[in-house]
Amino acid sequence: MKAVLVQMLKGYKRWISPLLPVSCRYVPTCSEYAMEAISIHGAVRGSVLALGRLLRCHPFVRGGYDPVPRSHSCCDDKISTTAHDAVR
């Protein structure tokens, strides 16, 4: 499923995106963000992240750098912080 979604996004970038005016206000672009999110987090969570990004990309937002989150769960930050504190 993940590979199919990524191939669809690549097709969009190659065949459809060049026909449309440049409108994404973020770096990476929304389609690049979606491909990366799906590759890192899988089809379901990556698609949810991509949908959230698409909803944030509109004319009334400033945009800018908005990378795909690397964390796989809500608890990753707490675990790494605890481990970091234990080393100190």
Swiss-Prot record:
Membrane topology summary: Peripheral membrane protein
InterPro entries: Membr_insert_effic_factor_YidD
Source species, domain of life: Bacteria
One Pfam family of this chain: YidD
Record keywords: Cell inner membrane, Cell membrane, Membrane
GO cellular component: plasma membrane
Cell compartment(s), UniProt: Cell inner membrane
Entry's family note: Belongs to the UPF0161 family.
Function summary: Could be involved in insertion of integral membrane proteins into the membrane.
HAMAP family attached to this UniProt entry: UPF0161_YidD
NCBIfam families hit by this protein: membrane protein insertion efficiency factor YidD
The protein's name: Putative membrane protein insertion efficiency factor
Organism, scientific name: Koribacter versatilis (strain Ellin345)
Origin organism lineage: Bacteria, Pseudomonadati, Acidobacteriota, Terriglobia, Terriglobales
